[in-house]
Amino acid sequence: MTTAATAAAIVTAGSVRFGNDLPLAVIAGPCQLESRGHALEVASALKEIATRLNIGLVYKTSFDKANRTSGSAARGLGLAQSLPIFAEIRSSLGLPVLTDIHDASQCAEVAQAVDVLQIPAFLCRQTDLLLAAAATGKVVNVKKGQFLAPWDMANVVAKITGAGNPNVLATERGVSFGYNTLISDMRSLPIMARTTGAPVIFDATHSVQQPGGQGTSSGGQREFVPVLARAAVAVGVAGVFIETHPDPDHAPSDGPNMVPLAEFEGLLRRLMAFDKLAKAPATDTR
């Protein structure tokens, strides 16, 4: 096994640079890939926003929501239909693309069509999956499990860097707090940055999720997305992860968490202002 000493302090996905001391970047898009037309519509809108605001943006969407609450819930278009759409978004819009992988056997094929492979929170300790993702050489974004302490992510990241891939992002998405509830401990952000050495991302939309809270699906408290996002950016992070949709209330998954696309630009403007303040040089007022 090849060993990389540490995670890269700056990770590049396409033209987007992530670093805890760099200007804020964003990972955004709908929860799942619903259709080619829908994906291109949202990706085009997000690119326009990112261009206006001069912020690096990675487009995210999922070809398979493999951990839905109910077995009858919609899961996405699947691998075969999704990969050409990912490739089209990259080639026609010039946006880097992120998607989840769920099994080691998927990594090499998916890596041909995307820039970032994402490890779902529930799978963050699955060594074979982490090693297969690392072997592609792509950026690997690991969601911290809802069951992990922030310092435990050091072992997760080390599995990837130890396989010779230093290009790792570590994402905070809340921790279980009783039944159907997640909370966000903002101390975890600097702890993860210090213990992993990786750029840290805050997932502002899954952090307000209420897992299984609607019986056969998860609920969420979308109104708290801006609150938690502002707090995380004020602490200081490399990027924010925000799921957005033109009509969240009719989305096939995670609708209660997602930010309406019409509100996305305003939210991002405010977060960029917080980021500028958080990363400004300290002023000696003595």
Curated annotation (Swiss-Prot):
InterPro entries: Aldolase_TIM (IPR013785), DAHP1/KDSA (IPR006218), KDO8P_synthase (IPR006269). Signal peptide: none annotated. Its EC number is 2.5.1.55. Keywords: Cytoplasm, Lipopolysaccharide biosynthesis, Transferase. It is found in: Cytoplasm. Coiled coil: none annotated. The keyword Transferase applies. GO terms for biological process: keto-3-deoxy-D-manno-octulosonic acid biosynthetic process. One of its GO terms (cellular component) is cytoplasm. It catalyses: D-arabinose 5-phosphate + phosphoenolpyruvate + H2O = 3-deoxy-alpha-D-manno-2-octulosonate-8-phosphate + phosphate. The keyword Transferase applies. Pathway: Carbohydrate biosynthesis; 3-deoxy-D-manno-octulosonate biosynthesis; 3-deoxy-D-manno-octulosonate from D-ribulose 5-phosphate: step 2/3; Bacterial outer membrane biogenesis; lipopolysaccharide biosynthesis. It is an enzyme of class 2 (transferase). Pfam families: DAHP_synth_1. GO terms for molecular function: 3-deoxy-8-phosphooctulonate synthase activity. Belongs to the KdsA family. HAMAP family: KDO8P_synth (MF_00056). This is 2-dehydro-3-deoxyphosphooctonate aldolase. The gene is kdsA.
